[in-house]
């Protein structure tokens, strides 16, 4: 029986159809047709990560500069820090780090890929042993041997830095490729991918986080090891450090040391940002 308004009396009879629009229907009681809310994701790179370390480095460098402006420096100290000597040493250090890292990447990553292929897996222990020898040898001793062999110059310094930094990238490349899920690789082969396609589209993207971690370690190692290039005639910030030690001029030593530490921290910060930004999406949740 219907009332004069056309509605069923006493709640009996047919009811009005439920609204089909997700904005009109219930969304919180779990019975409506509205889609479940998606979980909010934290940004992969926060403002704190972007600004804290650079701000701290700028503050330290500014404090160092203000101290030098007010310090009473003798003629020898001023000569060691003037006429573009500091900028020249810093630029040489950056060049040594960049060139050595480039060669580390083009040597260690392809070699790591090669040593994970079935035909060359037996050679992996020997290659890792050589890489371990390169890093286990004291850097100053290795540089001295290279200077005896190649002579004084940047080439000996670069080879020593490269030999010292190959291990982390090589070992992380091998570990990253070996850690891939075999079922994913079989699925890729099952849909008709070639071996090269499996490597470039499945294996390497999954191994990117570990490879980038190795590259980050190698970068910091290169910045530190490049200070020893001065003993082989390679230049760099080590020139300021050794000059400050031999001449007993603490300000020169402080400048070389602070710039080396600041450059290492800056390189590590840039590498950490690259590690976050270049990581394939979906491999890890959160930053």
Which residues fall in each region the model found?
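Hydrophobic transmembrane alpha-helices
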Residues: 130-136, 146-149, 159-173, 228, ...
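Short helix-to-coil transition segments within interhelical loops
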Residues: 177-183, 187-207, 233-235
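Cytoplasmic-entry segments and transmembrane alpha-helices of multi-pass inner-membrane transporters
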Residues: 111-146, 171-179, 186
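Transmembrane alpha-helices
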Residues: 163, 195-229, 251, 255, ...
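C-terminal transmembrane helix and the adjacent membrane-cytosol boundary/short C-terminal tail
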Residues: 2-4, 254-287
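N-terminal, non-cleaved signal-anchor transmembrane helix
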Residues: 1-102, 279-287
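Loop-to-helix entry region at the N-terminal start of transmembrane alpha-helices
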Residues: 88-100, 147-168, 208, 252-256
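Membrane-embedded alpha-helices of multi-pass transport/permease systems
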Residues: 107-113, 156-185, 208, 215-223, ...
